[in-house]
Amino acid sequence: MAGRGRRRFRLVALDMDGTLYSSRGYVEELERAIVVLVAEMLGLSMEDAARRLMEAKTRALTTSASLGLLGIRRSEFYERLSQMVNPASHIKPRPGLEDRLRRIKACGVKIALHTNAGRPLARKVLSALDIKPSLFDFIVTSDDAEPKPSPQGYELLLLSAGCRAEQCIYVGDRALAELRTAKMMGMFTVKVGGRESIWADLHAGDIVEALELIEKLIKD
């Protein structure tokens, strides 16, 4: 851990879905709504929409990146999707999460949110978690940059924070869809949940544990 102290790290960037919370119920609701919406926007049957989406995700890795391959405007898609789902039915505030985020900010480190969701849906998820968007120094969504795994959003994070890649800690739950890009750019990566990965420098069971490890890392 030597040399990774306070003067090195200036930014902690956090993925949202699957990282700040874990909810199978919400994931299932979201996946159903996504297929319904793809079917509506492309004029397809549900079966064909699910097949087309699966084929696109095989190439693009994430739903957001797949939308471009399907010829769907992301901004319209996520605006409509945000009206179809209710995150608060499944996601509840996580005790200790906001406190841990504030402790990291108190170390003089910026906190950012990086999500492939559009801004309206991100606001609903944060509301379900009882976290105000203003807690983050800045938020990058698929409305602001090309979605993960494209490096564009990561570059915007660094530009907004005024720091280099090696001064950023990136936290996410998906190795190939998000941590790989961060790691290849030179960021320090933390994986939340699931199996350990070659693309993660640290692994944590959940977000609170991850933030505890990060605080120690920053103060080391």
PLM regions and their residue ranges:
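N-terminal helical cap/lid subdomain that shapes the substrate entry/recognition surface
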Residues: R4-D99, R103-C107, G118-R123
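Asp-based, Mg2+/Mn2+-dependent phosphohydrolase catalytic module
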Residues: M1-V12, E98, R102-K105, V109-D220
